[in-house]
From Swiss-Prot:
GO biological process, any: ribosome biogenesis
Occurrences of domain OBG-type G (ranges): 169-349
Origin species: Bifidobacterium animalis subsp. lactis (strain AD011)
Known cofactor(s): Mg(2+)
Source organism phylogeny: Bacteria, Bacillati, Actinomycetota, Actinomycetes, Bifidobacteriales
Molecular function terms, GO-annotated: GTP binding; GTPase activity; magnesium ion binding
Enzyme class: hydrolase
Name of the molecule in the record: GTPase Obg
Assembly with partners or alone: Monomer.
Length: 570
């Protein structure tokens, strides 16, 4: 099995964020001294990093599932959980990251380009780690002094990606099988490719570093091409993509072929046809030179063989008519290699200067279009990118069942952070959604109490029956020590500063109290003057009888008054 692998499908998952803690600080004489739950740690991310020492994607074939570490849970005493370590995966320089498309259980196909790691040190976050949940200490405020809940950590990103290696070399050696490409790269560099006297000996690209004085450049030995390679014949498109990154294409032509249908000119035109057909379907990055317009070099090989020199001298004028530089070499005797080496180095130097100028001009000419701000959107992190808070869509299954789907960064994140086993946390979620305007928007879309509402899509969607009058937090709990959500009445009693009165308030309360007493005394004097009260100096129950007279509740009494002038009841 070859050690060279240039395309793999990898399943990456970021670490989950740690859950927040819902702790209460307990001290002597203060059994409930306030919340002290810490925040959960952030999950680690899966990061791809271009490394010059990496030459293949072989490691990903045997280990296609990569997961970063998760963050730990927060603790009491406001101790935050530790963050999960990032998982940094080295990939060869020239690796392109694609979005994997396809049904579950079937081979994935490349989709949109996510990243192009063309330079050493380039990084790409393939799967971001989840954020840690907030503890109840971070959730406390003036109105929610003792939250009885904490937020859950968010799960890390999870998806499939396709890694595709496109070799980055200054010069690409192309030619028919057994043209001597591997022998040439072995003669010009320290590379040691497999060399044999049969076709398709080279099955994987070989890279070699060539030194020409103080100039250093790289050459790539692309496996042999044949007519129809652009349609999949021979090795097909398997290695044609390695030519995309090379700025110079060198045709290595065999001058001693024994095939009667082949000659140096026909070999050149046949390979150019395949390169042109492959380039038609190629989507090059902005500013890149199309493959048909890149510089060509003709290398006539094996001139040390009898009659090969005569054939090379015969076809040389034909190539020169096409304005193509021609070099006659022998990889066996090393004839002409020095001249070829310095000629390629000079051409590479010129192309590098053109590439630098082209990249600068592309950056200067790039047009940035800034969209107008729309109602219901907001800026993220002060940048021009706008983010719509949420979207609501009414959906149905065609059988009379319908529901409302709420999508948006904030609502979906809040749902993932909510512990639905905690009623107070559910009430907190309801308040956040109402404050964001979700409830008002649901009413505008025709939602009624009891309708099904789904927040998010896919496996992480949460469905529930909408109740716009849902009680909040602590009000849903059966506890005599709980006030409004997030409050504990025992903590309210310990706050003496809240009952402290100002001097003006004290004077006002004193005057109100004295006025109330004076009013009571005046009322008592009026009742006594009206005869509703008996003489308090006599110890009997006549004041009770007199009070009954005042209310008109006596129906019968004696005609003759008593010795003290009072009436006696029957």
């Amino acid at each position: 099995m070859s050690d060279f692998v240039d395309r793999v499908t990898v399943h990456v998952k970021g670490g989950d964020g740690g859950n927040g803690s819902a702790g209460i600080r307990r001290e002597k004489y203060k059994p409930l001294a306030g919340p002290n739950g810490g925040n959960g740690g952030k999950g680690g991310s899966v990061i791809l990093k271009a490394d010059q020492n990496a030459t293949s994607l072989l490691d990903f074939r045997f280990m296609p599932h990569r997961t970063a570490d998760s963050g730990t849970m927060g603790l009491g005493d406001t101790k935050d959980g530790s963050n999960g370590a990032d998982l940094v995966l080295p990939v060869p320089v020239g690796t392109v990251v694609f979005e994997a498309r396809g049904a579950q259980g079937f081979p994935k196909k490349p989709g949109a380009v996510l990243a192009d790691l063309r330079h050493a040190g380039d990084t790409y976050v393939a799967a971001a780690g989840g954020a840690g949940g907030l503890g109840n200490a971070a959730l406390a405020n003036r109105t929610r002094r003792a939250p009885g809940f904490a937020l859950l950590g968010e799960p890390g990103d999870e998806r499939d990606i396709i890694l595709e290696l496109k070799s980055i070399a200054d010069v690409a050696l192309v030619g028919f099988p057994s043209a001597g490409k591997s022998s040439l790269i072995a003669a010009m560099s320290a590379a040691k490719p497999k060399i044999a006297d049969y076709p398709f000996t080279t099955l994987v690209p070989n890279l070699g570093v060539v030194q020409a004085g103080d100039m250093r450049y790289t050459i790539a030995d692309v496996p042999g091409l044949i007519p129809g390679a652009s349609q999949g014949k021979g090795l097909g498109l398997t290695f044609l993509r390695h030519i995309e990154r090379t700025e110079i294409i060198a045709h290595v032509i065999d001058c001693v072929t024994i095939d009667p249908d082949r000659d140096p000119l026909s070999d050149y035109y046949a390979l150019e046809k395949e390169l042109g057909e492959y380039a038609d379907d190629l989507d090059l990055p902005l500013g890149a030179i199309p493959i048909p317009e890149r510089p060509r070099v003709i290398i006539l090989n094996k001139i040390d063989v009898p009659d090969a020199k005569e054939l090379a001298d015969f076809v040389r004028p034909e190539f020169e008519k096409l304005d193509l530089p021609v070099y006659e070499i022998s990889t066996a005797s090393h004839a002409g290699l020095k001249e070829l080496n310095f000629a390629l180095a000079k051409l590479v130097k010129e192309m590098r200067a053109q590439i630098a100028e082209r990249e600068e001009s592309v950056d200067e000419e790039r047009v940035v279009i800034k969209p107008l701000e729309e109602p219901g959107t907001q800026r993220r992190n002060g940048r021009n990118a706008q983010v719509r808070e949420f979207e609501i869509e009414r959906e149905d299954d065609g059988h009379g069942n319908f529901w409302f789907t709420v999508t948006g960064v904030k609502p979906e994140r809040w749902v993932r952070q909510t512990n639905f086993d905690n009623d107070e946390a559910v009430g907190y979620l309801a308040d956040r959604l109402a404050k964001l305007g979700v409830e008002d928007s649901l009413r505008k879309h025709g939602a009624h109490a009891g309708d099904e509402v789904r927040i998010g899509r896919g496996e992480r969607a949460v469905a529930f029956d909408w109740d716009p009058t849902i009680a909040a937090g602590a009000e849903m709990l059966d506890g005599t020590q709980l006030g409004s959500r997030g409050k504990d009445l025992r903590l309210e009693e310990e706050d003496g500063r809240k009952r402290r009165r100002t001097n003006s308030e004290r004077r006002r309360e004193y005057h109100e109290m004295m006025d109330a007493r004076a009013a009571v005394r005046a009322a008592m004097q009026a009742e006594r003057a009206a005869g509703h009260w008996a003489d308090p100096s006599i110890d009997d129950d006549r004041h009770d009888e007199q009070s009954l007279f005042g209310r008109g509740e006596v129906e019968e009494y004696e005609d003759e008054p008593g010795a003290d002038g009072s009436r006696q009841l029957d």
